[in-house]
């Protein structure tokens, strides 16, 4: 079977997995989404200080929030943690210090290898997505 590209995982986050909070997400899916998510916000950041740029930035943020949360929940499932840890990450976005902590936690979640075997959240996505 053909391996999915990083961009395919990004597109599937908005189509197939927009509000999918069940199952698991492999590291490749996590980083594929993160790469294109960061590129979009880097481009929007250049226009964020203009009148329409602020509105566009907020609209894109609101549209991308559900797939971002669902991916984080499924990634937590892959490392055998409850998706409820996502709430702690969202709460930490409020103060500036919390943002730094949330970024570090996001990187750790994206780097830690998932459970090799099936766990209570589903089959290993590395094996089942090939």
Indicate residue ranges for each PLM-predicted region:
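Hydrophobic alpha-helical transmembrane segments in multi-pass membrane proteins
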Residues: 28-72, 79-111
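Membrane-interface extramembranous regions at the lipid-water interface
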Residues: 1-36, 67-85, 108-130
